[in-house]
Curated annotation (Swiss-Prot):
The keyword Ribonucleoprotein applies. The lineage of its organism: Bacteria, Pseudomonadati, Pseudomonadota, Gammaproteobacteria, Pasteurellales. InterPro entries: Ribosomal_bL28/bL31-like_sf (IPR034704), Ribosomal_bL31 (IPR002150), Ribosomal_bL31_B (IPR027493), Ribosomal_bL31_sf (IPR042105). GO terms for cellular component: ribonucleoprotein complex; ribosome. This is Large ribosomal subunit protein bL31B. Keywords: Ribonucleoprotein, Ribosomal protein. GO terms for molecular function: structural constituent of ribosome. Pfam families: Ribosomal_L31. Part of the 50S ribosomal subunit. GO terms for biological process: translation. The keyword Coiled coil does not apply.
Length: 88
């Protein structure tokens, strides 16, 4: 392997999906300042995931309710009165 072509921070990182309490240790350059002790007793840099193949409905076949309102509905709520002002 050539020297000096790989990033300095290439190391084992724990990617952890908190919604299903499942994680994977993968070699990565992901930037993070959090750490977590894993099942093997070692401490790894932690990269938290909102969703993964373990929790995404496409992969699990289960339906999941979103607990946050989408960007489009927030936009529509904010500007719902504008259309009545511009129509003549």
């Amino acid at each position: 392997m050539k020297k000096g072509i790989h990033p300095e921070n290439y190391r084992e990182v724990l990617f952890y999906d908190g919604s299903v309490q499942q994680g994977w240790i993968i070699r990565s350059c992901a930037a993070t300042n959090k750490t977590m002790v894993w099942e093997d007793g070692k401490e790894y840099p932690l990269y938290p995931l909102d969703t993964s193949s373990a929790s995404h409905p496409v992969y699990t076949g289960k339906r999941r309710e979103a607990n946050t309102e989408g960007r489009a509905s927030k936009f529509n709520e904010r500007f719902k009165g504008i259309s009545s002002l511009t129509k003549k």
